[in-house]
């Protein structure tokens, strides 16, 4: 009698799992997409704060150029990959005032902070103006 009780409990438990697992699988992509969107928002916000504090003095508050190139330019943003932008921030540009910001190169930014900056710059892309001579910055134009 007690064996049949355990078998019944086991079968009911298995039936619950069989029903619950597909329901969880249906919901999982939505949860993952929500988490990704939330992380993207947070990266954009933090990247914007990092940019304002560390980059705006040379590149302008909205990335519209200064003594450094215009980063909020359609030409720059469409011509470079995320990895290229990250490498420019990490290692700097030899022979220019753009110093290295990555920890491995003596800078102060972690890889995550660099990714946050890249995410912020990418958030400017949909409304980026066309600036054919974006490399010059404002002082050279």
What function would you assign to each model-found segment?
Residues 17-43, 56, 61-76:
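His/Cys-centered metal/cofactor-coordination and adjacent catalytic loops
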């Amino acid at each position: 009698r007690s064996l049949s009780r355990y078998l019944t409990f086991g079968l009911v438990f298995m039936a619950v799992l069989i029903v619950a697992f597909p329901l969880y699988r249906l919901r999982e992509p939505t949860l993952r997409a929500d988490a990704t969107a939330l992380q993207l928002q947070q990266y954009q916000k933090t990247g914007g704060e990092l940019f304002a504090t560390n980059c705006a003095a040379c590149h302008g508050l909205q990335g519209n150029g200064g003594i450094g190139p215009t980063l909020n330019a359609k030409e720059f943003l469409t011509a470079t990959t995320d990895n290229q932008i990250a490498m420019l921030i990490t290692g700097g540009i030899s022979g220019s005032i753009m110093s290295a910001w990555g920890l491995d190169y003596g800078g102060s930014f972690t890889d995550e902070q660099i990714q946050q900056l890249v995410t912020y710059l990418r958030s400017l892309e949909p409304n980026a103006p066309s600036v054919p001579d974006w490399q010059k910055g404002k002082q050279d134009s």
